[in-house]
Regions:
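Mature extracytoplasmic/periplasmic domains
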Residues: 288-364
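Early extracytoplasmic/lumenal segment of secretory-pathway proteins
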Residues: 19-94, 393-397
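Periplasmic-binding protein-like
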Residues: 108-110, 215-222, 265-289
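C-terminal motif of bacterial Sec signal peptides marking the signal peptidase cleavage site
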Residues: 15-16
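Conserved C-terminal helix/tail region of periplasmic/extracytoplasmic solute-binding proteins
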Residues: 352-439
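Ligand-binding pocket segment of bilobal, Venus flytrap-like solute-binding proteins
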Residues: 175, 182-186, 194-270
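Ligand-binding "clamshell"
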Residues: 91-100, 130-133, 258-273, 336-340
Length: 439
């Protein structure tokens, strides 16, 4: 049996040797996270720009750990991958990324369209002296906050995380099952006084996984644990639109989906980033060290930074592109729909009073209260999360191990399959992730 397996693997390797990778671009992205018509259009655009043909092999994943295991352990030769912020940090630490050269000949450098705010945040992502801005380009971003139903919860009360502790909402609270997001958001909130006084700052605080800080967050979670109706990965949006839950700690992308769905049935749902502070998250394009078509990968990332493509991706996914500038601002402005807010941090100093969606582009004063997540002591945070939920901590370890091995098995099966795994999105604002765990 072992001999048969070895022969099969050898055959796959020989097949790989004969593959002309200069005409193939392997892209590995989150499911439902791109306007897939852009994939075909890129192939045409790339030939126009370079005179060379390329065919995209597009595959999707639902969990960061699956993607990472294929690259780190399976040495998969994906050319472009879209990991989350803390995974980019981990890949930098583990020497899994190639530097991103920005020479495109006569083709403009569209990467310069990334909003300065995003570039500043990526400056906070480092691994052994390597800066994320030299090895990655941000793609989408968002925040962590509260989806709430104003029929039951007042706007003023939803402006504080303490709304979760109100015993009147017992059984009506949902918690996103994402330990890193929740921990960092609450850590920032619980240290508001120290941040305001200068004893702590939003850059270094999210790295803090000391026993004291973990206990602080754990005790806070336990203070309203009895009110939590469920720890949701994806069902929270539906529970909110059915009024089975009144408040949900979640991501801004899920919030926008729920708000849109609720509006279609005449329901009012809203999103709040509490005054005590929260966190922002990012996903970005990288070129793994085992990539084979680096040139096409660079051009693909550049292509995704064109303003018109950024708007199309937002329309398709419902998430927020990192691309700023007047073209995107004009597309996203709606004076009849939204009150004016200060989005100068994203669109430039002239955008200090613009009518954009506050769920997608929070006011400057709100964003300045948000830190960002980092790749910090996953094991300790998992144990805390398991204690709060009442899970068996070893079960999480087992799940992670299974994900790694499942990823390797899948890698062998699909490594040389050239079928395009392109999932058709059925609605404009369908969320791209049924599960977005940050392990």
């Amino acid at each position: 049996m072992k001999r048969i397996l070895y022969l099969a693997l050898a055959a796959l390797l020989l097949m790989g040797c004969s593959e002309d990778r200069s005409q193939i671009l392997k892209v590995y992205n989150w499911a439902d996270y791109i306007d897939e018509e852009l994939l075909d259009e890129f192939e045409v655009w790339y030939e126009e720009q370079t005179g060379e043909k390329v065919e995209i092999i597009y595959q999707t994943f639902d969990i960061n750990e699956t993607m990472l295991s294929k690259i780190e352990l399976g040495h998969e030769d994906y050319d472009v991958v879209c990991p989350s912020d803390y995974i980019i940090e981990r890949m930098l630490k583990n020497d899994l990324l190639l530097p991103l050269e920005r020479e495109f000949g006569d083709t403009p450098d569209y990467i310069g369209n990334v909003a300065p705010f995003i570039r500043e945040k990526f400056d906070e992502i480092e691994g052994y002296g390597k800066n994320a801005n030299d090895y990655s380009v941000a793609y989408m971003w968002g925040t962590v906050g509260l989806i709430y139903n104003p029929k039951y919860i007042a706007e003023e009360e939803a402006s504080s995380w303490n709304v979760l502790r109100n015993p009147a909402y017992k059984g009506k609270v949902l918690m996103k099952d994402a330990f890193r997001d929740v921990y960092t958001a609450l850590l920032v909130a619980l240290n508001k006084d120290d941040i305001d006084s200068g004893k702590a700052d939003l850059v270094s605080l999210p790295f803090d996984t000391s026993e004291k800080s973990i206990s602080l967050v754990e005790n806070y979670l336990n203070s309203f644990k009895e009110s939590i109706a469920g720890w949701e990965a994806d069902f929270g949006k539906e529970q909110m639109t059915k009024e089975l839950a009144w408040i949900n700690l979640s991501w801004s992308g899920d919030a926008q989906w729920a708000i849109d769905e609720a509006a279609e049935i005449g329901m009012d749902l809203r999103y709040s980033i509490p005054d005590e502070g929260s966190v922002v998250w990012f996903d970005g394009w990288v070129i793994p060290k085992y990539a084979k078509n680096i040139k096409a990968a660079r051009y693909f990332i550049n292509y995704m930074c064109m303003p018109e493509n950024a708007v199309r991706n937002m329309d398709m996914t419902g998430y927020v592109s990192v691309i700023g500038g007047n073209e995107v601002l004009e597309a996203m402005s709606d004076e009849e729909e939204y009150d004016a807010l200060d989005a100068s941090y994203f669109f430039g100093e002239d955008a200090d009073s613009v009518s954009v969606n506050p769920t997608m582009y929070p006011d400057n004063s709100t964003i300045m209260r948000c830190g960002m997540m980092h790749d910090s002591d996953t094991e300790a945070l998992l144990k805390m999360w398991s204690r709060v939920k009442g899970d068996n901590a070893s079960a999480w370890t087992y799940i992670l191990i299974c994900l790694v091995f499942a990823g390797l098995i899948a890698a062998v099966i699909i490594k040389y399959t050239r079928k395009r795994y392109r999932i058709k999105v059925s609605r404009k604002h369908k969320t791209r992730r049924k599960n977005r765990p940050r392990y």
